[in-house]
Amino acid sequence: MLRQSDFKIAIVGAGPAGLTLASRLTASSHSFDFTVFERRDKPDPSQVSVPCANLDLHRELGLRAIKGCGLYPQFLEVQSACTEQTRILDITGTVLSDTTGDGERPEISRNALIQLLLESIPEERIRWNTKVLDITPANCSRSKGKECLRFTDTSIATTPISEEIYDLIVGADGAWSRIRAAIPNAPKPIYSGVCYMTMYLRISREQYPDMDNMIGSGTFAVVGDNKLLLAQRAIHGTLRVCLFLHSKCLAAVRKELLASMHNHNTGPCPLLNPDDLINSLPSNPKTLQELLLTHDDFFASWSEDIKRLLRIAFESQVADAEIITRPMYMLPLVPYPYAHQRGIALVGDAASLMTPFAGRGVNVAMADSLDLAEELERLHLVTVSSSASTPAAIFADKLEGALSAYERTAYTRAKDAMELTWRNLCLSFSEKASDLFAAVMAS
């Protein structure tokens, strides 16, 4: 029989991907020896009450993972106040689409999802405040074929570097994954061409009945002019407003892109630099509001109702607040997938970083983790049913076949999601985005 201590798994990252994998391994009827490494502090349960981004979990992806972890009843109790209604307008305020959803993609806040998953994992399985530095092949003969994980405790000012040997290291460590970096020739994230900023405010029906009606009860989006406004209902009557700006909203960048003759089907133009846009935008809410609402490169030509919403959002920020503009990154569409690396598996953004313009990121991440856990379970069944005297060795020998099977499924799904996301980004920030959206909605 394969003992728990015979085969060790390291999961690097405690986001939705890493925690889904840990939750599914915990729920397994088999005994898996795994440790989750996370550089941040353990989130306090009270953070569930802090407004944050909402995630719509797709039935065949994120919801399938929730059910696979045995958490569906608990999930139903913590769904977001944001409904599945989606309203899409153009910059004149004309409604292009208004749908109510069919219950197939329920919303949950990111904080609530993290807490839901955390509550299903034994506390001792997660090492908080632990920064993974790198991984290297283990160099002792008895650990041949295994990986050495080097890490340090970030909660202590001066702490020595520690090392541990693992049979399998799972990279769930996001966009700038150190585990992905250990794979030869694996690409680094590239700038998608889009930057964003986020604000939170309260829009009550009593105070702003017209705004409340325009926004609706779920997600509200305005597309056009190389920009996208997205507003989502959050907990406690809060509204989360995101402004997505493509670098080409700047006239100088548009001219440069036109001259480049870049084929956008292959991905973002390498000439795009997020600093061009970020350095043109102040962080002070009052100054930023003045620039965005009056300059032709930004929202000056948008309808008065939409500009009023933006004005309310900016004026709702505290006086000394800073509104930070951040770039959005993605992994290149080609080459993909990457070469298999012995003893390593990637899930979520570490494997397939994409922008949010198809809503697939967290769904693909959770589906990755579920599929990987199920491959490990199948491998465990084969191993424990073997009559061999060294089941751990058999498990290790057959591991690469299980990882390859996982990658065939995960990378096919991820490639489709990455390509769809890129097409949606191009559509959202095209010169005639509103017309194209209307055609898509009518088809």
Swiss-Prot record:
Keywords: FAD, Flavoprotein, Monooxygenase, Oxidoreductase
Domain of life from the UniProt record: Eukaryota
EC number of the protein: 1.-.-.-
Pfam family, one: NAD_binding_8
Function comment: Monooxygenase; part of the gene cluster that mediates the biosynthesis of the aspoquinolone mycotoxins. The role of asqM within the aspoquinolone pathway has still to be determined. The first step of the pathway is catalyzed by the nonribosomal peptide synthetase asqK that condenses anthranilic acid and O-methyl-L-tyrosine to produce 4'-methoxycyclopeptin. 4'-methoxycyclopeptin is then converted to 4'-methoxydehydrocyclopeptin by the ketoglutarate-dependent dioxygenase asqJ. AsqJ also converts its first product 4'-methoxydehydrocyclopeptin to 4'-methoxycyclopenin.
EC class name: oxidoreductase
Lineage: Eukaryota, Fungi, Dikarya, Ascomycota, Pezizomycotina
A single GO molecular function term of this UniProt record: FAD binding
GO terms classed as biological process: biosynthetic process
UniProt cofactor(s): FAD
Record family assignment: Belongs to the aromatic-ring hydroxylase family.
Organism this protein belongs to: Emericella nidulans (strain FGSC A4 / ATCC 38163 / CBS 112.46 / NRRL 194 / M139) (Aspergillus nidulans)
SUPFAM superfamilies on file: FAD/NAD(P)-binding domain
Pathway connected to this protein: Secondary metabolite biosynthesis; Alkaloid biosynthesis; Mycotoxin biosynthesis
Protein name: Monooxygenase asqM
